[in-house]
């Protein structure tokens, strides 16, 4: 859902120079396609904010035409990120900056040019193959621990001994493993 908010009261403020870029806050002086990697990263993880019209040092520069810039940002996101991320755009009228707030998405991974991104402190980087697989599972609402284990010939002698010592469970069976979410009848043992 995309929302334009023309904000006449809320202002980023003159003290923005005290603010620094973080894992969830990015400054962009102008609108270039590089912000799309950050939109992917924010959608894939914890969300975040990109403020356009502010340089890397936190100095407000403003944008020449904030309304047109807002439309440009929306079009770039809609044309370049798949699936469609959840975001809002706010024009800060008193300093001609634009605040893009990106929510963490549910349909992960969010891709820009067929690649998924994440934030590493203040940098945006491409995820590796393992992390990409984890994002796919998360997008399907599946955790690694819920996947069937490739090796179904497992023994739980140490677990049995510890359960016996700590909480006096003497009867160790598949029902015990089901209770611990380590086994189900359909898929057998899981990760």
Regions found by a protein language model. Give the residues of each.
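Polybasic/polar functional segments that serve as interface/processing modules
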Residues: 1-50, 54-116, 150, 173, ...
């Amino acid at each position: 859902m995309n929302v334009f908010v023309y904000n006449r009261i809320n202002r980023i403020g003159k003290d923005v120079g005290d603010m620094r870029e973080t894992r969830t806050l990015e400054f962009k002086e102008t609108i270039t396609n590089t912000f799309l990697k950050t939109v992917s990263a924010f959608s894939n993880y914890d969300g975040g904010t990109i403020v356009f019209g502010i340089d890397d040092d936190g100095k407000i520069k403003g944008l020449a035409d904030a309304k047109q810039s807002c439309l440009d940002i929306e079009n770039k996101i809609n044309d370049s990120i798949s699936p469609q991320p959840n975001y809002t755009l706010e024009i800060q009228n008193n300093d001609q900056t634009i605040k893009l707030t990106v929510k963490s998405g549910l349909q992960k991974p969010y891709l820009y040019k067929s690649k998924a991104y994440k934030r590493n402190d203040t940098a945006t980087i491409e995820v590796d193959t393992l992390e990409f697989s984890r994002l796919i599972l998360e997008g399907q609402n599946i955790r690694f621990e819920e996947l069937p284990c490739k090796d179904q010939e497992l023994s739980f002698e140490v677990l049995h001994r510890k359960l016996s010592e700590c909480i006096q469970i003497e009867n160790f069976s598949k029902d015990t493993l089901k209770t611990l979410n380590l086994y189900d009848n359909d898929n057998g043992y899981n990760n």
